[in-house]
């Protein structure tokens, strides 16, 4: 099933586009009729890998994020969100999103919101780490983005947050079957990596 994205915002190249919440709600209902297992929403841009700290676009308004998640939950779906940026991720967590994919440039408030609301974070470090040395993007920017993400993963783990492995396979430099995500997460989480990731993966399985 394709992710759902707002018309004119990031995700249109891969997802199904809606123009307003009424149309989104109708699409969610259609997903239920077609036997979908969950809903994925696109609520922010992605990282500009040439400029540290920059996203290709801001996230959707918090009230919109809240409604998107509420509508899907009312239909009985778990919701995963492509989300970057502290305020966007915080809004999604406070609205009860089940998992956050990517989650670049988070701060303490966003991390606490995810932990307190039981959000599983799938940080997809390999989408950043695998860009190193390819020459496609600014190497200093890529290194800084990865360092920031790894620091946040370590902080979230220290809080007792739920972290699950996920590669975003099919993204540039992230081939199917790659184990680079595990290597990066193990680098961050150390000897506790297996226990932390098993706990997060079990929660993903329970939710989805």
Regions found by a protein language model. Give the residues of each.
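Glycine-enriched alpha-helix->loop->beta-strand junction motifs that scaffold or abut catalytic
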Residues: 94-99, 115-121, 160-162, 189
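His/Asp/Glu-enriched, well-ordered alpha-helical/loop segment
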Residues: 74, 137, 146-208
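Divalent-metal coordination cores built from histidine and acidic residues
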Residues: 1-53, 57-71, 119-124
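Hydrophobic faces of well-ordered beta-strands that scaffold small-molecule active sites
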Residues: 1, 39-41, 79-81, 100-101, ...
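Short beta-strand/loop segments at the ligand-binding rim of alpha/beta enzyme cores
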Residues: 68-80
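Short, electropositive alpha-helical surface patch
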Residues: 57-62, 66, 92-105, 173-188
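Active-site environment of divalent metal-dependent phosphoester hydrolases
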Residues: 5-6, 45-50, 84-90, 105-108, ...
């Amino acid at each position: 099933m394709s992710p759902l994205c707002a018309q004119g915002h990031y995700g249109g190249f891969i997802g199904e586009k809606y123009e307003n919440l009424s149309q989104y709600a109708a699409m969610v209902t259609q997903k239920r009729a077609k036997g979908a297992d969950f809903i994925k929403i696109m609520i922010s841009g992605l990282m500009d890998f040439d400029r540290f700290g920059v996203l290709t676009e801001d996230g959707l308004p918090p009230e919109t994020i809240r409604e998107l998640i509420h509508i899907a939950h009312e239909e009985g779906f778990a919701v995963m969100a492509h989300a970057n940026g502290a305020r966007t991720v915080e809004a999604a967590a406070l609205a009860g999103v089940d998992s956050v994919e990517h989650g670049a440039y988070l701060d303490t408030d966003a991390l606490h919101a995810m932990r307190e609301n039981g959000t599983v974070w799938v940080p997809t470090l390999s989408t950043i780490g695998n860009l190193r040395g390819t020459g496609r993007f600014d190497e200093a920017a890529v290194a800084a983005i990865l360092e920031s993400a790894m620091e946040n993963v370590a902080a979230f783990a220290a809080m007792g947050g739920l972290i699950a492995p996920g590669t975003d396979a099919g993204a540039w430099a992230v081939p199917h079957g790659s184990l680079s995500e595990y290597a990066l997460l193990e680098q961050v989480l150390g000897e506790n990596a297996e226990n932390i990731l098993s706990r997060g993966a079990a929660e993903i399985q329970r939710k989805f």
